Each structure stands twice: as structure tokens, then as C-alpha cells.
Design a protein with these regions (language model features):
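Beta/alpha (TIM)-barrel catalytic core signal, keyed to glycine-rich beta->alpha loops juxtaposed to Asp/Glu
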Residues: 1-162
Length: 162
């Protein structure tokens, strides 16, 4: 497609894929990222917080009122993602950062541009702090290991499969 478009003086500017610590096929997505880098195409990550699952503190089981869909998502993914979220919490505690910042820095570490849905002022203020620090290689590797060993990932198309 890239060469076809070049022949027509057109180009792909961005590619948007599901990319988070809970995405399936992250190795495939990393291959797509490499192709994007080679062709100067921005790689955008949708659902980098995995519908908020990656923001759920592993030590808190009741997180208040949620919609029917959110309740289903959290009930389905809370236990299988506990170890991953514990690793995220360890990093967030060491960095005095939120779990959301850890998840987004995992994206940034790889040169990925996350698309984040923010609904509340406190979320906006929190995400602004993501630019004040970077993951170390060790922290990145800890997250990668925990992500790979996570037994339940999001479906390939979470918008039609949840």
C-alpha cells in the first residue's frame, strides 16, 4: 500500500492500532511500528489504558459506580491482570506516579503516540505529569515480562468483542 500510494504522490500519515500492555499480538504491532518508522508514519495507540483496566489499583477491589459495560470489563479482567497491575503499582509507587502514567510511559518508551480518553479534570492534570519522567530499561522489561505472562488479553477488536 505504501508503495502504491507513493506512485500516486500520496502517503499514509498515521496508523492507529490497539496497543497497550493488555493488547493481543503486541509483537505483531511492534513489527508494524518498525514499518511505520521506516516510512515516517506516525504510530498511534488506541486504548492504551485498556478501557481503564490498567488504571485500577490492584489493592482496591471496589472502585465505585460504573456502567454495566465497565462492570463487565472490570469483572472479566481484574483477576487475570492482577500480577501486571502489581508490577505497574510497584513502578508507580517508586515514581510517585499514577498507573495511567506508567501505562502511557510504556507506550512512549517505544516511540508510540497514545490516544487517551480523558473525561475528568483530575485525569487531564494527572496525564500532564506523564511527561515529567521516563521509564528505565529495567522498568520497561519488568512491564514487558508481566504483560507477556498475563493470562487474559483484550480481544483483537475490543469494540465488537466485549
Amino acid at each position: 500500500i505504501i508503495n502504491f500510494l507513493k506512485d500516486k504522490n500520496k502517503r499514509v500519515s498515521t496508523v492507529q492500532v490497539q496497543f497497550s500492555l493488555l493488547s493481543p499480538n503486541n509483537e505483531k504491532q511492534k513489527h508494524v511500528k518498525k514499518i511505520c518508522d521506516q516510512n515516517k508514519i506516525d504510530f498511534l495507540a488506541y486504548s492504551p489504558l485498556a478501557f481503564g483496566i490498567l488504571c485500577q489499583d490492584p489493592s482496591i477491589t471496589d472502585t465505585g459506580k460504573r456502567s454495566l459495560l465497565r462492570n463487565f470489563i472490570f469483572q472479566t479482567y481484574s483477576k487475570p491482570t492482577l500480577e501486571l497491575r502489581n508490577v505497574m503499582k510497584e513502578i508507580s509507587n517508586a515514581r510517585s506516579a499514577s498507573l495511567a502514567q506508567v501505562a502511557l510511559n510504556w507506550c512512549f518508551y517505544q516511540g508510540v503516540i497514545p490516544i487517551v480518553g480523558l473525561r475528568k479534570k483530575k485525569q487531564v492534570l494527572d496525564i500532564c505529569n506523564v511527561f515529567k519522567w521516563d521509564l528505565t530499561q529495567r522498568e520497561f522489561e519488568m512491564l514487558e515480562t508481566a504483560s507477556k505472562s498475563c493470562v487474559k488479553k483484550l480481544p483483537d477488536n475490543p469494540f465488537s468483542s466485549l
